[in-house]
Curated annotation (Swiss-Prot):
Motif 'HIGH' region per UniProt: ranges: 32-42
One cellular component term from this protein's GO annotations in UniProt: cytosol
Keyword rRNA-binding in annotation: no
Protein name as annotated: Cysteine--tRNA ligase
InterPro entries (UniProt xref): Cys-tRNA-ligase, Cys-tRNA-synt_Ia_DALR, Cys-tRNA/MSH_ligase, CysS_C, Rossmann-like_a/b/a_fold, tRNA-synt_1_cat_dom, tRNAsynth_Ia_anticodon-bd
Residues involved in ATP binding: 277
Keyword line: Aminoacyl-tRNA synthetase, ATP-binding, Cytoplasm, Ligase, Metal-binding, Nucleotide-binding, Protein biosynthesis, Zinc
Taxonomic lineage: Bacteria, Bacillati, Bacillota, Bacilli, Lactobacillales
Gene3D superfamilies, A to Z: Cysteine-tRNA ligase, C-terminal anti-codon recognition domain, HUPs
Quaternary structure note: Monomer.
GO molecular function: ATP binding; cysteine-tRNA ligase activity; zinc ion binding
Gene of this entry: cysS
Compartment(s): Cytoplasm
Cited SMART domains: DALR_2 (SM00840)
């Protein structure tokens, strides 16, 4: 098995991937805070790491994939109050919405989807260990982490303590300044602010966990003290992932993660502004899937290398749809030939081209999941396949091999060729077949005017007609 090379955010270089257990991968990806529908930017992370997971599975690895739900924090509390429902009710609503959206996008379910509120006992025990080891301290029911005590603090985000303290001092209020030993200390446990705020009993009084501690607890509980891969958006690199390292390694005295991976942002508009809820420039997956095919959105977002930014636009979505149509039309074309009565002949050149494409596909994906090069290798094969399918020397066995390989390659990107070929956007297949039959009848009767009229009608419907010795074929444009 050829080695995958991964860009490790911690070391800032590509490294050969070596799992802790040969043939098995432990993978943790930070999930959503479930106070609203996910937007396209949130979905980028889910799609990027699902694509990476699928490629590992394509190579034969067993992947244990854990992705959490943050179901309690300030945003959850504020939104629940605004909707006049409880925090658990809000969480249930948007967890279900998340699962519906990700299912529509053909994102594989996580092996486990732990929820922060289901792990309170373990969170409290984790915090107690940090206090006992001198890494945390309690102030009036709040518990803070002593960031400066952890000697590697700032390494993931490539910042030194002085830079971090200067940045933190600009954002801390007077009350926090008086409570914290240092501006860069962060909350592990937050005291209840009022009797109506959701809270749990703890050794420090009623309260709830901080955001960062939740992921440390859930990742180490379900994947062990050291994890192969930890992923998330670039915006989580600091402070969230930096704090996860500090918490986890202080508790376990072991390396927390071997490979840190961060996906790029989704941008919008000519200025390519980052999509975010705070900037009010976001589009939810829930809304966009009412307008476009889920496979188009999925393929569009999976077809850009995970570390690069994606510019979300209608034009780019149309380009993705056009590429999927090329795949679909090729599959339609070869299935016509496989099903017809033409005897099959052996084409060593086509088989060789398919095998060479597979080598190029694997080489590209092994290079930090270079999806653009991987897809280019497939695109370059399509004319070769179609040329064989349209020739008198058709190799049906090779066409079947191509279809099998294409199904596996596209599934890495979350595209199911059975669903792709079953799509009936616009006119349905029966209507088209009826018009094609009428045109064939007109041609047989040498009624060229009617034949041309039907061809023009089909063209307006987005259907291209091809007359071959084996009969009339049609494809959607």
């Amino acid at each position: 098995m050829l080695a995958v090379r991964i860009y490790n955010t911690l070391t800032r270089k590509k490294e050969e991937f070596k799992p802790l257990v040969p043939g098995q991968i432990s993978m943790y990806v930070c999930g959503p805070t479930v106070y609203n529908y996910i937007h396209i930017g949130n979905a980028r992370s889910s799609i990027a790491f699902d694509t990476i997971r699928r490629y590992f599975e394509y190579k034969g690895y067993q992947v244990k994939y854990v992705s959490n739900f943050t179901d309690v924090d300030d945003k959850m509390i504020n939104e629940a109050r605004a909707e006049k429902i409880t925090v658990p009710e809000l969480a249930e609503k948007f967890i279900n919405a998340f699962l519906e959206d990700t299912t529509a996008l053909n994102i594989e379910p996580a092996t486990l989807h732990p929820r922060a509120t289901h792990e309170i006992k373990d969170i409290i025990n984790f915090v107690k260990v940090l206090i006992d080891k001198g890494y945390a301290y309690e102030v009036d029911g709040d518990v803070y982490y002593r960031a400066k005590k952890f000697q590697h603090y700032g390494e993931l985000s490539d910042q030194n303590i002085e830079q971090l303290e200067e940045g933190a001092s600009e954002h801390i209020n007077d009350e926090e300044q008086n409570r914290k030993e240092d501006p860069i200390d962060f909350a592990l446990w937050k005291a209840q602010k009022g009797p109506d705020e959701i809270a749990w009993d703890s050794p420090w009084g009623k309260g709830r966990p901080g955001w960062h501690i939740e992921c440390s607890v859930m990742s180490t509980k379900y994947l062990g003290n050291t994890i192969d891969i930890h992923g998330g958006g670039q915006d989580l690199e600091f402070p969230h992932h930096e704090n996860e390292i500090a918490q986890s390694e202080a508790k376990t005295d072991q390396k927390f993660v071997n490979y840190w991976m961060h996906n790029g942002f989704v941008t919008v508009g000519k200025d390519q502004e980052k999509m975010s809820k705070s900037l009010h420039n976001f589009v939810t997956v829930h809304d966009i899937l009412r307008k476009i095919d889920p496979q188009v959105l999925r393929f569009f977002m999976a077809s850009v290398q995970y570390r690069r930014q994606i510019n979300y636009s209608e034009e780019n979505l149309k380009q993705a749809a056009t590429i999927l149509d090329r795949f679909k039309n090729t599959l339609t074309n070869i299935n016509y030939r496989i099903a017809d009565d033409t005897p099959t002949k052996t084409s060593e050149d086509l088989v060789k081209a398919i095998n060479e494409t597979e080598e190029k596909f694997v080489a590209a994906m092994d290079d930090d999941f270079n999806v653009q090069n991987a897809l280019t290798s497939i695109y370059d094969l399509l004319p070769v396949v179609n040329a064989n399918a349209n020739s008198d020397n058709v190799d049906k066995d090779a066409l079947k091999l191509f279809e099998e390989k294409l199904a596996a390659w596209l599934l890495v990107f979350g595209v199911d060729i059975k669903k792709l070929c079953a799509q009936t956007t616009g006119s349905n297949d029966e209507e088209i077949e009826e018009l094609v039959s009428k045109r064939d009848e007109a041609r047989n009767n040498k009624d060229w005017a009617t034949s041309d009229q039907i061809r023009d009608q089909l063209k307006e419907m987005g259907i291209t007609i091809q007359d071959t010795p084996q009969g009339t074929r049609w494809t959607r444009d």
